[in-house]
């Protein structure tokens, strides 16, 4: 017989007391980032009940089981409300996997190394932007790995979405109607590059002459023919009170146009339920939202490590559920020992269709694992949940340079009020020879300038 030092409800009581007292530090048995700094493993910060789904459910669920409508109520407290409804009423399933202990499998290596090296150096300046001593921009990694406030948590993800200095994601998008059929199917490319806080691309940590910018980001569509060549470029100022400059190329006009940049709750293409505002749950400048509050803490189920389908030559994923068996990606989830739930409200938009958003973050990495937005009446409206992975499986491996690539693998963006679903997956390549790449300086010239938009539109 094994005697447990902490009973099953110890963690629940701890999280409730911490929230009531406004104590925001992560970890139950010890400060989380002290445990990570010691060994690269967060396990010492949590009791056994938070380190396995079998322990949490007292043996009623175990690794390898499927969560279905028949047993989802056992883990209802671990799921955001829209995902629960998808399982309960729409045939969604989740496969359970062991909890990942090694923190290096949950973020890019260089990003994590910079987080540890620069821990404690970040501060907000008088305008609320993240700086180091001397007032210069952030120098790399997560500025607030042991965040104490909601705005620190959101500042971290807004500052660096994909956690690489540069990335190009080859994407397949599928937009489904309420009847469960794919109504639109797009091949798309999404590029990101950071001019500041660089951790592996020279020059580091800043790209000279661009220290006033936070990121370059673009999206273009390579198929079908009706959308081919349509492309958009966002250039983000470092100042988080300012909207990005948004440029677009529409083949019918054969020229670059500047678009209104505050219309971030509208789809870029027909059929999609995905908005610019949704990107990484933080697609808008930090101070165009406000009233950031930590409103919940506790364990969660999330797809943080098993999303890559190495067995498919193009990394494509299988689907299930919904009226036609096409609505949901096959998804593997695991028990996250501690998630932090943050609420925020749009303040910089005159006609935002949402009144607030709730975002769940893995406390170990401050990675957003799910989001639910609410309409102006306060009813659930839209959900965004992603799956992540280290791109290493058996003998299969995709590298970001010296280390296996870490990134998102697939996403659901679901409108619960209409029943429409957008599914995205990161694949190896798309139409036109565009292939997923990471930390490649050529990404800028190929995808992140107005000249690049023209070339993509005419290519």
Which ranges hold each PLM region?
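N-terminal secretory signal peptides
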Residues: 1-38
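Flexible, processing/modification-adjacent segments and terminal tails
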Residues: 137-186, 238-243, 249-337, 442-459
């Amino acid at each position: 017989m094994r005697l447990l030092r902490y009973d099953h409800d110890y963690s629940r009581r701890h999280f409730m007391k911490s929230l009531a007292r406004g104590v925001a530090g992560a970890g139950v048995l010890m400060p989380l980032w002290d445990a990570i700094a010691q060994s690269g493993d967060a396990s010492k910060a949590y009791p056994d009940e938070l380190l396995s789904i079998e322990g949490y459910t007292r043996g009623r669920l175990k690794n390898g089981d499927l969560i279905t409508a028949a047993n989802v109520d056992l883990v209802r407290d671990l799921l955001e409300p829209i995902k629960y409804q998808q399982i309960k009423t729409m045939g969604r399933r989740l496969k359970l996997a062991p909890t990942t202990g090694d923190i290096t499998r949950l973020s890019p290596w260089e990003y994590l190394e910079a987080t540890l090296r620069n821990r404690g150096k970040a501060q907000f300046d008088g305008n609320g932007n993240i700086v180091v001593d001397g007032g210069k921009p952030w120098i790399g990694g997560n500025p607030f790995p042991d965040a104490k406030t909601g705005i620190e948590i959101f500042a971290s993800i807004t500052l660096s979405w994909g956690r690489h200095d540069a990335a190009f994601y080859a994407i397949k998008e599928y937009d489904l109607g309420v009847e469960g059929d794919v109504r639109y199917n797009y091949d798309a490319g999404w590029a990101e590059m950071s001019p500041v806080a660089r951790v592996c691309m020279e020059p580091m940590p800043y790209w000279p002459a661009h220290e006033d910018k936070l990121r370059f980001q673009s999206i273009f569509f390579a198929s079908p023919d009706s959308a081919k060549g349509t492309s958009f470029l966002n250039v983000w100022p470092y100042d988080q009170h300012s909207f990005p400059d948004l440029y677009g190329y529409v083949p019918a006009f054969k020229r670059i146009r500047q678009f209104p940049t505050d219309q971030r709750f509208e789809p870029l293409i027909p059929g999609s339920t995905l908005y610019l505002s949704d990107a990484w749950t933080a697609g808008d400048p930090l101070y165009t939202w406000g009233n950031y509050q930590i409103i919940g803490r506790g364990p969660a189920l999330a797809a943080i490590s098993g999303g890559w389908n190495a067995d498919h030559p193009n990394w494509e994923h299988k689907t299930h559920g919904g009226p036609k068996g096409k609505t949901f990606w096959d998804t593997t989830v695991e028990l996250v020992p501690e998630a932090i739930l943050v609420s925020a409200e749009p303040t910089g938009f005159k006609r935002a269709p949402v009144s607030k958003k709730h975002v769940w973050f893995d406390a170990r990495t401050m990675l957003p694992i799910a989001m639910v937005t609410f309409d102006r009446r306060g009813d659930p409206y839209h959900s965004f949940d992603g799956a992540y992975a280290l791109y290493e499986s058996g003998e299969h491996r995709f590298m970001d340079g010296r280390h296996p690539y870490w990134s998102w693998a697939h996403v659901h963006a679901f409108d619960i009020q209409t029943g429409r679903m957008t599914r995205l997956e990161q694949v190896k390549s798309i139409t036109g020879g565009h292939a997923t790449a990471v930390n490649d300086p050529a990404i800028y010239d190929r995808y992140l300038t107005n000249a690049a938009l023209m070339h993509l539109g005419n290519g």
